Structure formats: C-alpha cells, structure tokens
C-alpha cells in the first residue's frame, strides 16, 4: 500500500481499512511520511493492528512514548485482544492486536493525556507532551524555567538521560526557554567575551570549533564527554545511536529480523526483499499460508 501523507489519525486508519487486499489475511502498510512498513491482519471482516506496532503508528501522529507505556494503557482500557487464529505462529497466547474500530482522534488525545499525567506537571506547555518536568538540559546548555529564578538550572545527566524520541517541535519549545547560568536569556551566539558561564573552561576550544555559536549548533552530545555539536536535532539523534548501539529501524518484512540505526539503511535493505517466488519462499516462511498472494 502507498503511504498516506497529510491525513489525520482516524482518516489514515480508514484509508488503510478501505485498501486492505480483498481475501487477504495479511496486508502490508507503509506508515505516513516514513519508510516503516507494518502488517495488518484481516479476520472475520475486521482489520486488526499488531499492538507492538502501535508505538510507531502513534509517533507518526505526534505521540511519542515508550512501547511499554502505550501497550499498558491499551491493555488497561480493554482495547487489546488476542488473535487466536495465529497461535501456531505466535505461541499459545496468540498475538496481541487492536481492532481498527477503536482507533480515533479521541484515543490519540487520551493516550497523550495519560502519558503526560504519568510523568508529572508540565512547564513547557507549548513544547509537546514529552516535556513533563520544569527543567531540562541538552548537552552543556542549561534550560531553566522562568518560574524558578536563577537557581533552577540542572544538567541533563542530573535529571534525565538523553531522550532520542524528542521531536523537532519539542526542541523548538525547549530552545525558547534557554537561559544562561546567571539567569539571562540566551538569544545570541556565544563569543569569547560573553560565553555562557556554564561552559567548562577545558571544553571551550572544542565548543567553539564545533558550534561556532549556540544559535548555529545548539545540540551537543554529552555521551562520555563527546561534545560533538550539531545544527539540527535529528542529526544529534542519529549521532547518539553510534554511542548506544541502538537500532530503532526494524525490518517489518515477515521472517526478517534485521534492524538498522538509520532509516536510509533500512530503505536500502528493503530492496533485498524482491517480489520473486524464491524470495517469498525464503523470507515469508510460515506466513505463506496466511495470504494466497504470498505463495
């Protein structure tokens, strides 16, 4: 299926349901504005989504949270069921799925509200649901809340680990609240004379080399004093994966367990899954009996 860029959450779900392959038990879906593929199941006339795919789906519509948070919320509200027909494939308990009929814009708001209330009060209300604490810091740039005065500054390692799920819109909200350690608002780039007091003396040369100014390269890696600075937040996110070894971009092709740190590498990998009968036999494995088009 082609991707549906620009649609709202419920409209996207309806589009997926309307284009499920007739007579197919499994259909391929491309998530909006991404190269990520998921597979939906059609059982007794209903279209079912894998619960574990929900975190990727919601991320496309602005709700970012851990998979465990989203799955637990869906289970607690009784929206999850077991797909008994696939016990042979997914074990005795079957596959946890969510029916497309429960997906709505209201559900999107419910999940976002649940995540915010679980994390605590917000200070940066216009920055997004992930900013749930009044003080955040990226790299050695300290972000304080206006309500806390000059003493409300902390380094990110003192409060939270690096969060690779922050989006650009969230970061824009953070950058609007930048303050130096003396309480002055950070609007201009740092210079040798007026550099922020919180920049360590030993790292000033490296900071100036990589960043030039806070405005030009405000996103700094703090992993083991790496201090690489980047102009765009997504570049910092991608760089951080080299330190953590994380591979968030997983191949959704049934039977394939490959994962990659970069989405472009995943897109390149998808080319190995050709549409020949030989590749279907090798890659789809036990999925073959589910859909006549796979044989």
From Swiss-Prot:
Q: Keyword annotations for this protein?
A: Metal-binding, Repeat, Zinc, Zinc-finger
Q: Which one of the record's GO molecular function terms can you name?
A: RNA polymerase II cis-regulatory region sequence-specific DNA binding
Superkingdom per UniProt:
Eukaryota
This protein's GO CC annotations: chromatin; PcG protein complex; transcription regulator complex
State if Zinc is listed as a keyword: yes
What range does the record give for the signal peptide? none
SMART domains hit by this protein: ZnF_C2H2
Show the coiled coil region(s): none
SUPFAM superfamilies (UniProt xref): beta-beta-alpha zinc fingers
The answer to whether UniProt assigns keyword Metal-binding to this entry is: yes
Record-linked InterPro entries: Znf_C2H2_sf, Znf_C2H2_type
User: Which residue stretches are annotated zinc finger (C2H2-type)?
Assistant: 219-243, 249-273
Name the chain's protein: Zinc finger C2H2 protein ECU08_0560
